[in-house]
Regions:
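Membrane-embedded catalytic scaffold of the fatty acid hydroxylase/desaturase
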Residues: 49-62, 77-78, 82-224
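Hydrophobic transmembrane alpha-helical segments in integral membrane proteins
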Residues: 1-16
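Helix-boundary and loop/linker segments of multi-pass membrane transporters
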Residues: 3-7, 34-39, 78-85, 119-120
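Membrane-interface helix-loop junction between the first two transmembrane segments
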Residues: 23-42
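Early transmembrane hairpin module of multi-pass membrane proteins
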Residues: 13, 17-20, 32-34, 100, ...
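Hydrophobic core of alpha-helical transmembrane segments in multi-pass integral membrane proteins
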Residues: 13-23, 63-65, 135
Length: 224
């Protein structure tokens, strides 16, 4: 499977996920809409389009070379403990999720990083469009961070893109304005990030905002 095929696969899941969660939050809204939805959709889509165009450069010249280096040389810490198999695949997924937990946390604790991440937190009325609202500076820096993780641990293209697909769907889900039964949400949030779980992170109250950093698995918030 080529890089182009895997990248197209990620884009397909991104589009399908966005359409799905947009439909679900339209039909089963949890909170009343404070602004016209088409304005929010247009604004966030414009940000996403701009970011997508600009991000082609760091992805092409930084991220992809790291992934190719790992693939060609089987370079990285995980190759010392496991060959390419299901065990390495699972470990790589968990490492990436832990890495994203710490990246998110760094964005809140470091004043320089917070200047970029604050753009995402300006939107306190979350919907699936909020998952598109990121400063280009944060995306570039996160690409550099991911590249270091990939090279150090020896994460392959397939492992990375699989995680990215699940991450995109998770971010779309837990930013969406979907009404979920409280009991079911409480059970689900013991394992993965849900809209209600992540809503607390988007309040203007700093104490609430400095928690719930997880991207997929909520266990990292409990451990760290």
């Amino acid at each position: 499977m080529t890089i182009e095929t895997l990248t197209s696969l990620k884009l397909s899941f991104f589009i399908l996920g966005f359409i799905l969660f947009f439909f679900l939050e339209t039909k089963y809204s949890n909170r009343a809409w404070k602004t016209r939805r088409y304005k929010r959709l247009l604004f966030h889509s414009t940000i996403a389009l701009f970011n997508t165009v600009i991000m082609r450069l760091p992805v092409l010249f930084i991220l992809m070379p790291m992934l190719l280096l790992v693939a060609e040389n089987q370079f990285g810490l995980l190759y010392l403990v496991a060959d390419y198999n299901i065990i390495k695949f699972i470990i790589s997924f968990l490492i990436l999720d832990i890495a994203m937990y710490w990246w998110h946390r760094f964005n809140h604790k470091n004043q320089f990083l917070w200047r970029f991440h604050f753009v995402h937190h300006v939107d306190t009325h979350m919907d699936v469009g909020t998952s598109l609202r990121f400063h280009i500076g944060e995306l570039i820096l996160s690409t550099l961070y991911k590249s270091v993780i990939i090279l150090f641990f020896g994460i392959t293209l397939a492992e990375f893109l699989f995680y990215e697909i699940i991450l995109v769907l998770s971010v779309q889900f837990h930013h969406s304005n979907i009404r979920i039964n409280d009991r079911f949400d409480a059970s689900l949030s013991k394992f993965i990030v849900t809209p209600k779980y992540h809503t607390n992170h988007h309040t203007r109250v700093r104490k609430s905002r400095e928690a719930n950093y997880a991207s997929i698995f909520t266990i990292w918030d409990k451990i760290f």
